[in-house]
Structure formats: structure tokens, C-alpha cells
Amino acid sequence: MKRLEVSNQAKLPTQFGEFCIQCFREKGSNGSKDHLVIFTPNFPQNPLVRLHSECLTGDALGSQKCDCGGALQMALERISKEGGLVIYLRQEGRGIGLFNKVNAYALQDKGYDTIQANEMIGFKDDERDYSIAGEILEYYRIKKMRLLTNNPLKIAALEKYAEVTRESLIVCANEHNQGYLEVKKLKMGHLL
């Protein structure tokens, strides 16, 4: 926990059920970044875990361009029933930040896919770093988990810290995100 400062725990009643929250402040050369963990009290030894990167447009604004908001809601619903946690990482836009994400969205509006748009503004298709999630898993002493994901990069990253069994999390396509989901499957190797 050398690069993390840990907050107190607080209760968080939600539409999905009762959770607790705790913040992890990542200290680094670029200042600090706060990540949030939402968890059920007394979660099981083999908990459901959702590693979720921040998506303001999908999570808070209900954007139909992605599957993020739906995936987060589905994860919270399942976790409230089965026990576990969501590690909510502040890595907006697959790690490029909100400003750049909006610029990438503008390119998508012109017909470029999500990967092409990121590359056109100088980024890789995915700039995220999941090592901080590994440190958070170690903090909670999680050695085995059922990971709610379709992303093979998340599986590979977390297998360094715990035994991972993947459980799929499928959000229905709509007219606005169908192409995005196809790119995730065909170009990014997502297990959809």
C-alpha cells in the first residue's frame, strides 16, 4: 500500500441495496487520483468483483454510445444479492480523460470507430493501468474472485494478484452502441 492512502468506510444505501464505500487515494508523479470501492458488508471469500473504469457519460448521464452505465448497474444489482465489490477506477475514456474522450466522440460522430478516434488524437486504444486494482485487492485480502467482465486485459491484470474466474456481463446492444460493441469484440478481443 506504499502508493495508496485509504479513507474510512461509510455506508451507502442505493437503489440496488445497502453497500459500504471506501476511497483509495493513489499518490504519484502526476498528483493524486481517488478511486472508489463499493462493497457489500461481509462479502464472501470468493466475491463477485467488477473492475469498472469511470465513464461519466455512461455511468451518470446515461449515454447510449457505450455499455458502461448498463454494465455498472448490472454489476451492482448482482453484487448486492451475491456479495462482492466494485472497484471504480478514475480512468475516464479508457484512460485518456474526459476532455480527450469528448474529442474522440466528435471523431466517432464523423464515422470513425472508437479505436481509430483514440489513435487520431494521439492515444492507444486502451491507456488504462490496472495495477492499482491489484493493490486494492491485496488490501481486502482477496485471493480468489469471480470477475464480472468481458475484457481479457482485466482478467490478465488481476490474475497477477488472485485466482480469477470470469463471469460474463452482457449489456444489450442498441442502435447507438452496436458498432462500438462490435469493435470491442473484433478488434479488442472482448468476450462478447
Swiss-Prot record:
Cofactor: Zn(2+)
Residues that hold GTP according to the record: R50, L51, H52, S53, E54, E92, G93, R94, T114, T149, K154
Amino-acid positions noted as binding Zn(2+) in the UniProt annotation, renumbered to this chain: C55, C66, C68
Keyword terms: GTP-binding, Hydrolase, Metal-binding, Nucleotide-binding, Riboflavin biosynthesis, Zinc
CDD domains for this protein: GTP_cyclohydro2
Gene Ontology biological process terms, A to Z: riboflavin biosynthetic process
InterPro entries from the UniProt entry: GTP_cyclohydro_II, RibA, RibA-like_sf
Keyword Hydrolase: yes
EC category: hydrolase
Cofactor note: Binds 1 zinc ion per subunit.
GO cellular component, one term: cytosol
Pathway: Cofactor biosynthesis; riboflavin biosynthesis; 5-amino-6-(D-ribitylamino)uracil from GTP: step 1/4
Catalytic activity: GTP + 4 H2O = 2,5-diamino-6-hydroxy-4-(5-phosphoribosylamino)-pyrimidine + formate + 2 phosphate + 3 H(+)
HAMAP family: RibA
Similarity field: Belongs to the GTP cyclohydrolase II family.
Entry protein name: GTP cyclohydrolase-2
Originating gene: ribA
